Amino acid sequence: MYFPMIELTLVLLASSNLAMSVRKEIRAPQTLSRGWGDDISWVQTYEEGLYNAKKRNKPLMVIHHLEDCQYCQALKKVFAESDEAQTLAQEQFIMLNLMHETTDKNLSPDGQYVPRIMFIDPTLTVRADITGRYSNRRYTYEPQDLPLLIENMNKAIHLLQTEL
C-alpha cells in the first residue's frame, strides 16, 4: 500500500513538472499595422478611414488580408520591406488593413477574396479603375506586382490632384 502511494506521487510530480516546462509560444503584441508597416499611421475602422480621407483630403488605401493566407503574407513582406511603398503610405494615404469584410459592397465589386487592395478618394468614391493585373481578381496583387502596386498608389495620388 505504501508503494502505490509513492508511485502516484511520482507520477503527479512528473506530470506537473512537465506541464510547467511546456511554455506557450510568446508572441509579439499585435499592432494596427499587423506587419504591413509599423511606421505607418493606421486607422482602426473603415468608417474612421473614410472620415479621415475626407477631412485630410487624402486617398484611403484599404488592404484586405488574412493572417493564415500565404499570398497575403508574401505580399505583406515585400510591402513592409519596400522603402518607396512605406514612404508613400506614410505621407500620402490614410491606411487601413482589414482581416474581415466591411458592409460596403463597393469594396468587393468582383468578389470577396484576399489579398485585395482598393483605393477610395476623399469624395468617398471607390476607385474601381485602379486595378491589379488580373482580370478575374482585379484588385489582387502578388509579391512580384509590387511595382504595379506602387504605380497604382501614385495613380491614386495623381488622380486626387487632377480630379479634385
Curated annotation (Swiss-Prot):
A Pfam family assignment: Thioredoxin_7
Protein name: Anterior gradient protein 3
Placement of sequence motif Prevents secretion from ER: 161-164
Any one of the GO CC terms: endoplasmic reticulum
Protein's gene: agr3
Function: Required for calcium-mediated regulation of ciliary beat frequency in the airway.
Superkingdom field: Eukaryota
Family affiliation: Belongs to the AGR family.
CDD domains noted in UniProt: AGR
Organism field: Xenopus tropicalis (Western clawed frog)
Main location class: endoplasmic reticulum
Signal peptide bounds: 1-19
Listed InterPro entries: AGR/TXD, Thioredoxin-like_sf
Protein keywords: Cytoplasm, Endoplasmic reticulum, Signal
Localization terms from the record: Endoplasmic reticulum; Cytoplasm
